[in-house]
Amino acid sequence: MPVVQGLIPINAEQIFEIGNCPRLALENHMVEKNYIRWLDSLTLDDIPLVGGKNASLGELAGSLTSDIRVAEGFAITAAAYRDLLESNALWPGMEQILTNTDWSDMEAAARESERLRKMIATAPLLSELDAEIRQAYLKLSQDHGRNIAVAVRSSATAEDLPGASFAGQHETFLNVHGAQNLVEAVRKCFASLFTQRAISYRINKGFDHQDVALSVGVQRMIRADRASSGVIFTLDTESGNRDIVMITGVWGLGEAIVQGIADPDEFLVHKPTLKLGHEHVLRHHIGSKEVKLVYAAASADEPTVWRKVGRSDQVKPCLADDEIIRLAKQAMAIETHYSERNGRPTPMDIEWAKDGPDGALYIVQARPETIHAPLDAGLLTQYHLDGDGPVILEGQAVGDRIGSGPVRLVKDGSELEKVGSGDILVATATTPDWEPAMKRSSAIITEHGGRTCHAAIVARELGIPVIVGASDATRLLKSGQEVTVDCSQGMTGRILNGIIPHSVHTVDIGKLEKAETDLMVNIANPNAAFRVAALPVAGVGLARIEFIITNEIKAHPMALLSPDQITDRGIRKKIAMLTSGYDSGSDYFVTRLAEGVATIAAAFYLRPVIVRTSDFKSNEYASLLGGRDFEQAENNPMIGFRGASRYVHPAYQDAFALECQALQRVRDDMGLSNVIVMIPFCRRIDEAKRVLQAMAQNGLERGRNGLEIYIMCEIPSNVVLIDEFAKLFDGFSIGSNDLTQLVLGVDRDSEILAADFEEEDPAVLAMIEQAIAGAHRHGLKCGICGQAPSDRPGFANWLVARQIDSISLSPDSVLGVMQRLARHQKSAKSRPSRRLAISAS
């Protein structure tokens, strides 16, 4: 919309539209504009004038490409708010209330904040302001239809600044029709500067109440009630990883996310590969989306109403993949613009809406992300549970912290006084104005909501662990019950019974002594990948896909390929439910496996990620849904039908083809070419050749697109014939557990022989030394990915002395082993050179 300067003529017919304004008369058809600024005339330099939210919208509307749509509208300046207080002489009385009230007293805070809001809400607006609001609304209506529906949003002058989000503190009004209703909404927005939550937040952040003013933004409503809407972050909200665009969405209006009422869909897009032209969604998580917020009829008492979402829409994503990619590109463009303007990287928090009638995607808000952006990236804090206990229930983790204490069930805001210091606040959902009670809590659990709702954002800012989407929490947990809330394991948060001790370790990565040998990490859970990737490691030495198959896919791949062969009708029904929304069972398997592997590969991009193809034993395969119809019972599965032998056997070769297709999709289609594929438990040279042939037939040809294929060196034949295996593969990874088992003839699962299972036995060490030397003879790398180097410093030192190329460790062992190895290597250099003795110390 063009900026309208100066005076605007008003005709007699427009008086009805504008309403009854005392200063407006037929003989004076001109109204001077003082308080209105059209959005596309604003920039970020106008924050003191129109607040952070409105200035940001103006920046988007006026400075970015036409690909980014911003709904037309105008801002009512912060001067209008200040003049309202001054013209009604409100501030002296308000200041007295603000000064004399104990804002930590919940009852007094609620009473006095309501009193402050009432003072503003009942004060008459300046007649000039009233007229200008109506006139601007008329102009907007002329462009888009009589009595156009508008969104009315507060925009504080201290809002959306680094370290200050003000998330959800001030009022928003949707689907506002008519000039009179708009004027009332503006008045309520001004009053919302003094909600209990807003007052408390300003006190905590050190803002003087008089220094913060409120502007109001008015925009044409996007008909997201007929489509979808949501939130975008240009980083991973839990780890702060900046290679990710995270998009959440629900059907209908975005308030369902903001209020934590609906469990949203969540989509991840990888920035570096998208920039290279790989337009693929990294990961889809489909939320339940059981309810949606839609516009009510114009005659209704409330402007919006909640509706149930049908089952078919609950399981369907609220955005198509091409729309997800389009939003990701827009978010990246916005981030780039703000970063260039600010002269520093500026991750963004963005709200989007899809218009039902025209299908277009709009950006309705954009602001700097305020939680991770200000943090020192060189500091790494790890939270570790030092014990265990029975898991009561699970949900989505917000943050990575751990908290424990007695449960305090809260039905609504009237019960917040019950929440004491150190309590675990449990509710169906929370709202941002619960912040004073949230501050007293050691953790929060809700039955609904997603990781981008306002309550989650505020909880991150407060440093409180939160679990959202924990179904039945208010039924399963009782007030006074002691529990531990664990968010340290990735996206899945756990509520455990009892008080379980935990430890916190913070290290400055820049000051760590680094080992000369590459340290890598073992990982299985994609949900933990972005957090683990913050460790100072050279990459992933072992990515186990068994976790993805067990927890994400859940079904035996052959059962997905041949569901008609499943004898149990109940299992057939479960598999049908799992695969609904996918083209076929094979499409389900390939998609879910590819997304899990891709998440790990993206987290560590461009570092190498060695992905081992499935290495379940037959009894483990049988435990998957439908598995018993495709697996034979074995007396000793540990050395039975596992690893490479399965891949070329008629009973499993079609399933292995699906694994290959998933890995090919990750590397070639999604652009994550840092994935190295590794074959486990390959007994014979002929078997290796047949496996490589099968891989090539399914898109994984060694050397194509830089593909490297490694082999696990975990069978004596791998060491004895290492010169032959070296001709077929690009690298080796020693599996010390299986190698020890097979060299010593000790069943690694046998309790009675546990004392004889010894990785540092001379026979095992001799095999490891031969393997390293054999790989190096052919110019190939040889690493190790067993547990022993984590537990035994002497063994790790011995490996380094044998010039092992890499040691892959569990994430919680990395920093300790790194520092021990660095000290050892430094000490070794200061001593005369000698061969290290084998030690189990």
Predicted regions and their residues:
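Acidic, glycine-rich flexible loop/linker segments
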Residues: 23, 87, 91, 357, ...
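Extended active-site and interfacial segments that coordinate phosphate-rich ligands
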Residues: 166-200, 224-298, 363-394, 440-447, ...
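Conserved metal-phosphate-binding beta-hairpin within the catalytic cores
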Residues: 168, 343-370
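Conserved alpha/beta-domain cores
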Residues: 145, 149-151, 156-166, 170-174, ...
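Short, Lys/Arg-enriched N-terminal segments with co-localized hydrophobic residues
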Residues: 15-29
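Conserved catalytic alpha/beta cores of large enzymes that bind or transform nucleotide phosphates
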Residues: 244-347, 354, 396-400, 421, ...
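N-terminal beta-alpha lobe that positions the nucleotide/phosphoryl donor
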Residues: 26-217, 226, 314-322, 326-327, ...
